[in-house]
Amino acid sequence: MSNAPRHFLDLDEMPTKELRAVLDAGVALKAKLKSQKARNTLREKPLEGKTLAMIFERPSTRTRVSFDVGMRQLGGESIMLTGAEMQLGRGETIADTARVLSRYVDAIMIRILNHDALLELAEFATVPVINGLTRRSHPCQVMADLMTFEEHRGPIEGRTIAWTGDDNNVLASWAHAAERFNFTLRIATPPELAPGKPMRDWIKSSGASIVLGTDPEEAVRGADCVLTDTWVSMGDKDGEHRHNLLKPYQVNTQLMSLAKPDALFMHCLPAHRGEEVTDEVIDGPQSVVFDEAENRLHAQKGILAWCFGAVG
C-alpha cells in the first residue's frame, strides 16, 4: 500500500468516486454541526493533534478563515504564513520549503498564483498539499459550489450549468467538474477573453459536455444554474479594457429570465455589484451566494478529512 500523501490539487486529477466521498463528507460534517441528531460516520475529532500550515502569497479573508475554522471544528489547528515571510522561490527553494514544512506540520494549504510552484511543493512534500487557489484553478471553491447546487437542486449529473464572463481559474475547475460529474457546462465569453488553447485542447480530449461560445443568452437559456465572477482578477492590469469587453455579459434579471424558472445564481464572491451582476440578481430569490460562502467551510472540511484519510 502506497504511503504517498493525499494531495488535493485539481479536480481532473481525482477519480469521481473520491470527489464524491469528499462532497459527502462535507455534507455530513455540515449536518453534524447544524444538528447533533444528524447521522455522522466520522470520528468526533478526526484531526485532533494535527496542524495545517496555510501559505498565502497575498492576503485572503475567506480562504484563511474557512480553513482555520474548519481545522478547529475537526479538532486540529492551523498556522498562517504570508508570502513576505516565506519568500517562496526567491530565498529558500520551494523544494526545500516543502521538505522543511513536512517535518513541522501535518498538511499544507497554499494560495499562490504560480501553479507550477504548487506542483513543485506537492512533489517534494511528504504531507498532503491542498490547492487553495492558483491562477490556473480553484478546486476548493468549485467543491463548495457543487455542494451548494446539490443542497438546493439534488444531483448535478445531467444538469446544465451556464458561465458568463471571462476565462479564469474558477471556470477551469468548473470544466474539470463537468467532466468528472457528467453535467453540461455552457461557456459564454468575449472572443478576446475565451479559454486558451491548453483548456480548449483539454476540453476536446476529455470528451466532457462543454460548449464554448460568445453569446450569453444562448449559454443561459434553459440552464439550471448561472455562474459568473469578477471581471478583473488578481494581477490583471487592463481593467478598463476588460470592463468594456464584458459589459454585455452582466448577469441581470433579463438574462436570468432566460434560464429555468428555478435556476440558481452563483458567484464565488467578493462581487462587484453593478458590474458582473446587478443587486436585483445577487440579492434576489435565485441567489445562493452566501450559501456558497458558508459551504467553503464545510466542503474544505471534507477535503481536509479526505487528505488525512478520515474518509474515502
UniProtKB/Swiss-Prot annotation:
Q: In which pathway does it act?
A: Amino-acid biosynthesis; L-arginine biosynthesis; L-arginine from L-ornithine and carbamoyl phosphate: step 1/3
Q: Which Pfam families match?
A: OTCace (PF00185), OTCace_N (PF02729)
Q: Which reaction does it catalyse?
A: carbamoyl phosphate + L-ornithine = L-citrulline + phosphate + H(+)
Where in the cell is the protein located? Cytoplasm
User: Which one of the record's GO molecular function terms can you name?
Assistant: amino acid binding
Q: Where does carbamoyl phosphate bind?
A: 60-63, 87, 111, 138-141, 268-269, 296
EC number(s) for this protein? 2.1.3.3
Cellular component (GO) terms are: cytoplasm
- Name one process (GO BP) from the record: arginine biosynthetic process via ornithine
Kindly report the protein's main subcellular placement as a broad class.
cytoplasm
UniProt keywords (A-Z) are:
Amino-acid biosynthesis, Arginine biosynthesis, Cytoplasm, Transferase
Write down the top EC class of this protein.
transferase
Matching InterPro entries: Asp/Orn_carbamoyltranf_P-bd, Asp/Orn_carbamoylTrfase, Asp/Orn_carbamoylTrfase_sf, Asp_carbamoyltransf_Asp/Orn-bd, Orn/put_carbamltrans, OTCase_ArgI
Residues recorded as binding L-ornithine, renumbered to this chain, are 169, 229, 233-234
Alphabetized HAMAP family for the sequence: OTCase
Q: Which family does it belong to?
A: Belongs to the aspartate/ornithine carbamoyltransferase superfamily. OTCase family.
Stated role: Reversibly catalyzes the transfer of the carbamoyl group from carbamoyl phosphate (CP) to the N(epsilon) atom of ornithine (ORN) to produce L-citrulline.
NCBIfam families named in the record: orni_carb_tr, PRK00779.1
Full protein name: Ornithine carbamoyltransferase
User: What organism, scientifically named, is this protein from?
Assistant: Rhodopseudomonas palustris (strain BisA53)
The gene that this protein is the product of is argF
